[in-house]
Swiss-Prot record:
[4Fe-4S] cluster binds at C82, C88, C91, C169. InterPro entries: 23S_rRNA_MeTrfase_RlmD (IPR001566), MeTrfase_TrmA_AS (IPR030390), MeTrfase_TrmA_CS (IPR030391), NA-bd_OB-fold (IPR012340), SAM-dependent_MTases_sf (IPR029063), TRAM_dom (IPR002792), U5_MeTrfase_fam (IPR010280). One of its GO terms (biological process) is rRNA base methylation. It comes from the Bacteria. Residues 11-69 form the TRAM domain. It catalyses: uridine(1939) in 23S rRNA + S-adenosyl-L-methionine = 5-methyluridine(1939) in 23S rRNA + S-adenosyl-L-homocysteine + H(+). It comes from Vibrio vulnificus (strain CMCP6). It is an enzyme of class 2 (transferase). Its EC number is 2.1.1.190. Catalyzes the formation of 5-methyl-uridine at position 1939 (m5U1939) in 23S rRNA. This is 23S rRNA (uracil(1939)-C(5))-methyltransferase RlmD. Belongs to the class I-like SAM-binding methyltransferase superfamily. RNA M5U methyltransferase family. RlmD subfamily.
Length: 438
């Protein structure tokens, strides 16, 4: 007998709306309630709040919901200061009092360290800076909408490729925020807006930097308008026709000062977003590492020399190692510029065994490492082979710090200090620093 196709019935959600009590926050800042004993994650909610939520996703072990109505607010809830909150993907915790955010981030750090490494320790005071107007770097997304014939200018929405149009951003430093409306007006009238990729904004110590990434040729008259805007704001203008090409059109080469050291950089180089927290972070790293005039120090993932240069002023020698060759060359130039002659820099793949590398043939007294979010799993097991009695680990991901800490503890190190660095206020993102000693 012939069988006819029958479409599967759509799974019906348990209910369009559910009233729940939020019990805690997850490590990404989402509220956690429980529905039939299953964790339900709801963005924009706080512990102790009674809310009405609409299920947007339901799996066997968890569900996600959208906040529909706030029935009982938490004492820590505050009014967001940005009109784009809940749309822009940048800040996700503007609804929470700042001091409560700090407490939440410190709890998160402690919980992760205990879960993965079994370590329990009293936290050092958090390193903080300005709550607002702290970002000295931002990437503005651009997209030409063929239907509306309008240029979309702003930041990506949360977990989306869509752009939230903005002409103000309260977490940007003032010299960058004031550029937004003017840049949008100028770029909207370019003859070939479909060639525009994004704008990178950086606040260097010698002025703002505007970098326009474009994917096709631009008219000279359009570039002239952009140059005029940059000159009026005493900013440096770069064009980036390809991801590995930079052309300085006007202005000075940018640099920033770091506790007495001048660090030149290009707009596509990595620098820390929060200048005040970065300065305090470097000072704390020096205090914890405590380099002496007889110490040989290894700086892994050294970048432009953010830590290497200050360490070199106190140690016998510094060896900086970085996975990006261009950064290695710039770090060496920066050392020379600052008249540092006891630092050397090497390019190496820090995701694999490095013990056989020439620079690793001698022992080191102390080590500092500052890896990317993925952590240092490729090399962490080799740290003890280098002979260091003291290791400072600067982390931008507490989960990978906790994972790598387990390896250091197994190598005989003790976790003696741990602290949170609030590099990104009003977001769930947290950075941290840990000191390990033998």
């Amino acid at each position: 007998m012939a069988r006819f196709f029958q479409p599967k019935k759509k799974l019906q959600p348990e209910s369009k709306h559910q009233q729940v009590l939020v019990e805690k926050l997850d490590h990404q800042g989402a509220g956690i309630a429980y529905l039939n004993k299953k964790p339900l994650f709801i963005d924009g909610t706080l512990p102790g709040e009674e809310v009405v939520t609409q299920l947007t996703e339901s799996k066997s072990k968890f569900a996600r919901g959208k906040l529909i109505k706030l029935l009982k607010p938490a004492a820590e809830r505050v009014e967001p200061f940005c009109s784009h909150f809940n749309q822009c993907g940048g800040c996700d915790m503007q609804h929470m009092d700042y001091q409560a955010q700090l407490a939440y981030k410190q709890r998160t750090l402690l919980q992760l360290m205990k879960k993965f490494s079994g370590s329990e320790i009293l936290l050092s005071p958090p390193v903080t800076g300005l709550e607002k107007a702290y970002r000295r770097r931002a990437r503005v997304s651009l997209m030409w909408d063929k239907k509306s014939r309008q240029l979309q200018f702003g930041f990506r929405r949360k977990q989306s490729k869509q752009i939230e149009n903005v002409t103000q951003c309260p977490v940007l430093v003032a010299e960058l925020e004031c550029l937004l409306p003017e840049l949008k007006a100028i770029l909207s009238h370019f003859q070939h807006p479909e060639h525009l990729g994004h704008v990178e904004l950086v606040a260097a110590d010698n002025g703002a930097v505007i970098t326009l990434r474009h994917t096709g040729p631009l008219l000279d008259e359009d570039v002239a308008k952009l140059r005029q805007c940059a000159e009026q704001h005493q900013a440096t203008l770069y064009l980036m026709p390809a991801s590995d090409q930079l052309e300085r059109i006007s202005g000075e080469a940018p640099y920033y000062q770091e506790i007495g050291f001048k660090v030149p950089f290009e707009p596509n180089n990595f620098i820390q977003v929060n200048q005040k927290v970065n300065q305090q972070m470097v000072v704390q790293a020096l205090e914890w590492l405590d380099p002496q005039s007889s110490d040989r120090v290894l700086d892994l993932f050294c970048g432009l020399g953010n830590f290497s240069l200050p360490i070199a002023s106190k140690a016998k020698s510094v060896t900086g190692v970085e996975g990006v060759d261009e950064m290695v060359q710039k770090a060496a130039i920066n050392a020379s510029l600052n008249q540092i002659n006891n630092a050397q820099f090497f390019h190496a793949n820090l995701e694999q065994d490095f013990v056989g590398q020439p620079w690793a043939s001698e022992k080191f007294d102390k080590i500092l490492l500052d890896p990317a979010r993925a952590g240092a799993s490729g090399i962490i097991e080799q740290v003890s082979a280098l002979g260091a009695k003291r290791v400072v680990y600067v982390s931008c991901n507490p989960a990978t710090l906790a994972r790598d800490s387990q390896s250091l503890l197994e190598q005989g190190y003790r976790l003696t200090k741990l602290g949170m660095l609030d590099m990104f206020p009003y977001t769930s993102h947290l950075e941290s620093m840990a000191l390990f000693e033998k």
